[in-house]
Curated annotation (Swiss-Prot):
Subcellular location: Cytoplasm
Bound cofactor: record note: Binds 2 Zn(2+) ions per monomer.
Name by which UniProt lists this protein: Chaperone protein DnaJ
Single GO BP term: DNA replication
Comment field on protein domains: The J domain is necessary and sufficient to stimulate DnaK ATPase activity. Zinc center 1 plays an important role in the autonomous, DnaK-independent chaperone activity of DnaJ. Zinc center 2 is essential for interaction with DnaK and for DnaJ activity.
One GO location term (cellular component): cytoplasm
Binding site for Zn(2+) 1: C147, C150, C200, C203
Subunit structure: Homodimer.
Predominant location category: cytoplasm
CC cofactor: Zn(2+)
Function statement: Participates actively in the response to hyperosmotic and heat shock by preventing the aggregation of stress-denatured proteins and by disaggregating proteins, also in an autonomous, DnaK-independent fashion. Unfolded proteins bind initially to DnaJ; upon interaction with the DnaJ-bound protein, DnaK hydrolyzes its bound ATP, resulting in the formation of a stable complex. GrpE releases ADP from DnaK; ATP binding to DnaK triggers the release of the substrate protein, thus completing the reaction cycle.
Taxonomic classification: Bacteria, Pseudomonadati, Pseudomonadota, Alphaproteobacteria, Rickettsiales
Keyword Repeat found: yes
Keywords for this protein: Chaperone, Cytoplasm, DNA replication, Metal-binding, Repeat, Stress response, Zinc, Zinc-finger
Amino acid sequence: MSQDYYQILGVSKTASQADLKKAYLKLAKQYHPDTTDAKDAEKKFKEINSAYDVLKDEQKRAAYDRFGHDTFQYQQSRGGGGNHGGFHPDINDIFGDFFSDFMGGGRRKPTSSKARGSDLKYDLTINLEEAFHGIEKNISFSSEVKCDTCHGTGSEKGETVTTCDACGGVGATRIQQGFFTIEQACHKCQGNGQIIKNPCKKCHGMGRYHKQRNLSVNIPAGVENATRIRHPGEGEAGIRGGNSGDLYVDIAIKPHDIYKVDGANLHCKLPISFVNAALGGEIEVPIIEGGKVNLTIPAGTQNGDQLRLRSKGMSKMRSTIRGDMLTHIHVEVPKNLSKRQRELLEEFKKESINEKENDGSFFNKMKSLWS
């Protein structure tokens, strides 16, 4: 049985991602062929990269823990990658050939060593103005890229890749045990179905290597919080010429100091003086695209009233229609008054009381409370 990935990295099965990365970097530095003359350095370095490639991916790691080293390694060598995040093994796929043989199925066709690369996820935070206008962002991340020395074949230039003579290119051998036929990964080609006699020195026969990447991604106008944008073929490069995975950019929009977002509508709190509330008028309010517009305040506006500015909200993806901006009125009462202001308010107070006494509405309301 092969040494499992946790043993290769020297960590426990409960190790955190931080512990895994720390162990990987330490071992990769120790066994990198360019920094040591040890005979088994290249083999060890390849094992370390393979182990970390699986355990750093939560979905691959879960599948590895569930199915075990040998089954996982065999399934992955057959290209058992999923569409979202890499390896999503299906128990029916893994043991499908076993039950096919039990029911009288024939021998499988030769497998391909060109496993699809894993999908990648990148979290990108933008502000509300960027979400409104749309923006092009440069992002940086590390991933497996196609080897530019062997062009993804995994073999030195000019060297041919041959079909494994032990399994006939199937990637598996079969053992008859009584009534049952058990299939296991080929010991000679490790389930690849092919033999690389002279592996590429740069990628160690994998057809890909780890590299820091820079990529420009376009964020469309009107993007909403938690939107996922797919970039086909920008994920990890496949093994030995396999198709690349996809890159998924998950958008998070920062909270804004003024606006709250509700779909395509924007909400904001608008403070006005009690004089403007009583008499009405116009007031300038800021808008998301920049600048200000005039908002009409009707006479008699009350605290908590809501006034709407049509088509002054967020833009919508793939649409010319915009949401609205809804202003929530907050009437401010002055804390400090001049002598003249106080006199005017006292006069206003007297007139207000007289009006209520004359129309009887105030006394009728008070009377109803005690009846």
